[in-house]
C-alpha cells in the first residue's frame, strides 16, 4: 500500500493517466491526495472530475481556487472567463450532481502529521486552528445558503486575519488563505499580485512558509497552487504544482519515501496570456 500526492492537474487528464501508470498506482490498495485545482484551463476538465468522483474511495481532493470558480459559475454567482474549460461540465446531463459532489469536498485534509491544502496555511494558525477554520467554510459550502456564499466569495479584502472577523468577511479570508495565498507582507497580510518565483520576490514580501512566526511547523504541509515555485521539499512543506498546465510537469510524491515521479506535459498554454 502506497500513499501518493499529486499537484495541480487543471484538466490535464492525459498527464494524470500517464503519471498514475508510471507509479503503478493501484486503486484497490493505494491512496491518492490531489492538491486541488483539478479542473479548468486544461483540455479535459470533465474527464478529470469524473475520475475523482469514480475513484472517491481511493482519491481525496481539497478544493482549489479554480474548483471554487467552477462552483460559482455553475451555481450562477460567478462570471465565466475566456480561459475557462469548464463548459463541458456545466452542459453535462450529470453536471449538477458533479457540482454538488465537488461542493462537498474539504479545504483541508489531515492524516497524522501530514496536512494537505491547496495554497497554504497562514503562519499564525496552528493546525488545530486551521482545521477549525476550514470547517467553518466547509459548513457554509455544504449548507442551505451555499449560493449566497458564492455571491460573497470574491474579493481581496480583508487582507489580514483578525479573530474578530465575522460573517462573509471572515469566510472570504479563510477561503482566500487556503486557496489563493502565495506571498505575505511582513505583517502577514495576503498579497495576491505577486505570482513569480521566490528569487524574484520583492523585499517587502516573503513566502507564507518562510514567516519566522510559523505556528504549524509540527506538521508537513502539502500544497500546490504556486506553479512558479515548482517542486519544493523544505521548511516542513512539500509544494507540488510544477506547471503541467503551462507545459511543465505533473508531479507525484510518495509520502512515505518522499520519492518524486514526474511526467512531461504535452504542449501547455501561454502563461503570459492569463493570471492564475
Swiss-Prot record:
Q: Write down the chemical reaction(s) this protein catalyses.
A: P(1),P(4)-bis(5'-adenosyl) tetraphosphate + H2O = 2 ADP + 2 H(+)
Annotated GO MF terms: bis(5'-nucleosyl)-tetraphosphatase (symmetrical) activity
The family database entries (Pfam families) matched by this protein are listed as: Metallophos
Top-level division of the source organism's lineage? Bacteria
List cystine links: none
EC number annotated for this UniProt entry: 3.6.1.41
Q: Which InterPro entries match?
A: ApaH, Calcineurin-like_PHP_ApaH, Metallo-depent_PP-like
Question: What UniProt keywords are attached to this protein's entry?
Answer: Hydrolase
Q: What class of enzyme is it?
A: hydrolase
HAMAP family from the UniProt entry: ApaH
Write out the function statement from the record: Hydrolyzes diadenosine 5',5'''-P1,P4-tetraphosphate to yield ADP.
Q: Which family does it belong to?
A: Belongs to the Ap4A hydrolase family.
Protein known as: Bis(5'-nucleosyl)-tetraphosphatase, symmetrical
Task: Say which species the protein is native to.
Answer: Neisseria meningitidis serogroup A / serotype 4A (strain DSM 15465 / Z2491)
